[in-house]
C-alpha cells in the first residue's frame, strides 16, 4: 500500500505519543481503519526500532543489566506464572525480545561462569526448551510471542517474505558464489519491462519504505546495484511513501507488490 508523505507523517506523529505495545497497535488500527493492517504494523515496527536504537545503550550498562536480572528473580519468586519479563519490558519501554536476551545472557553467565556465545543465546531464544530452567524458558517464550517488532518469530516472517521465488531470476546466493559482494536479491536472466521500464534486477524488502530507510538503501545498496547491473525494481511488500518513487527515469522503480504486467523482452522480440 502506497501512502502520501502527509499520510505517513500523520501516522508517525500518532505513534510518537503512544507506548510501543500491542494495545497501542490496536489503537493505531482504530485510528487509521482505511490503511492496510500490514502497512500499519510495519510503520509501527520501524518507528519503534528507531526509538530502540536511541535508547539501546542505557539498557545494556552493567547497572541496568543487574537491576533487570534481580527484578526478574524477585518477580518469579513471588509468582513464577506471572509474565514478569514481559511486564518489565513494557515498564522499561524496551522490546520484550531484547529484554529476554539481556536476562538470558545474565542467567547463563551465572550458570557457566563465562560469557555465553551469541550462537548459544540465539539458539535458546529460537527454542526456549533448550534453556535449563523451566521458569525462565516460559518467560522467554512469552516475550518472544508478544514482540511484534523484534525476535526470532519476526525474523522468520521477514525471511519468508524476502525469499519469495522468481522463476526468471538468479538468486542472491548464486551471485555471491560468483564473487559479487553487494548484490540484489535476484538478477533477471532475461531483462523484462515493467510499466515501460527495463528491469535487470529485483530487490525485496519486508518493510515499509519510509524516507530514512529508503535513503539509506539508495546509498548503501540500490545505486550500487544500478551501477553494476543496470536499472532495477525494489518491492516494498508493506508499501512505501509514494513521493519516494522519483527515480524511475534514472532506473530504480518502486512497487508494493510483484508486478502483473511484466513483458519478457526475449518473448517480445520473438513475436516481431
Curated annotation (Swiss-Prot):
Keyword Cytoplasm in annotation: yes
Keyword set includes Thylakoid: no
Cystine crosslinks: none
Any GO CC annotation of this UniProt entry: cytoplasm
Main location: nucleus
Keyword terms: Cytoplasm, Nucleus
Residue spans crossing the bilayer: none
Compartments reported by the entry: Nucleus; Cytoplasm
Swiss-Prot/TrEMBL GO biological process terms: erythrocyte differentiation
A Pfam entry, by short name: TPD
Family matches, as InterPro entries: CDIN1
Role this protein plays: May play a role in erythroid cell differentiation.
Protein name per UniProt: CDAN1-interacting nuclease 1
Gene behind the chain: CDIN1
Amino acid at each position: 500500500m502506497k501512502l502520501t508523505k502527509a499520510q505517513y507523517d500523520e501516522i508517525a506523529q500518532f505513534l510518537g505519543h503512544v507506548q510501543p505495545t500491542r494495545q497501542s497497535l490496536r489503537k493505531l488500527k482504530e485510528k487509521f481503519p482505511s490503511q492496510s493492517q500490514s502497512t500499519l504494523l510495519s510503520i509501527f515496527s520501524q518507528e519503534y526500532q528507531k526509538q530502540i536504537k536511541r535508547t539501546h545503550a542505557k539498557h545494556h550498562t552493567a547497572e541496568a543489566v543487574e537491576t533487570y536480572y534481580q527484578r526478574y528473580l524477585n518477580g518469579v519468586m513471588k509468582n513464577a506464572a506471572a509474565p514478569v519479563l514481559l511486564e518489565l519490558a513494557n515498564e522499561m519501554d524496551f522490546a520484550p525480545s531484547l529484554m529476554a536476551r539481556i536476562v538470558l545472557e545474565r542467567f547463563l553467565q551465572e550458570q557457566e561462569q563465562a560469557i555465553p556465545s551469541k550462537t548459544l543465546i540465539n539458539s535458546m531464544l529460537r527454542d526456549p526448551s533448550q534453556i535449563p530452567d523451566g521458569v525462565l524458558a516460559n518467560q522467554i517464550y512469552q516475550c518472544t510471542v508478544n514482540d511484534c517488532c523484534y525476535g526470532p518469530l519476526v525474523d522468520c516472517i521477514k525471511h519468508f517474505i524476502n525469499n519469495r521465488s522468481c522463476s526468471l531470476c538468479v538468486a542472491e546466493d548464486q551471485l555471491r558464489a560468483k564473487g559479487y559482494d553487494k548484490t540484489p536479491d535476484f538478477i533477471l536472466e532475461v531483462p523484462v519491462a515493467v510499466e515501460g521500464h527495463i528491469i535487470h534486477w529485483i530487490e525485496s524488502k519486508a518493510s515499509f519504505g519510509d524516507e530514512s530507510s529508503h535513503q539509506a538503501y539508495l546509498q548503501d545498496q540500490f545505486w550500487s546495484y544500478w551501477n553494476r547491473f543496470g536499472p532495477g525494481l525494489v518491492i516494498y511488500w508493506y508499501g512505501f511513501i509514494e513521493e519516494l518513487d522519483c527515480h524511475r527515469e534514472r532506473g530504480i522503480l518502486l512497487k508494493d507488490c510483484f508486478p502483473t504486467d511484466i513483458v519478457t523482452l526475449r518473448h517480445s522480440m520473438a513475436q516481431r
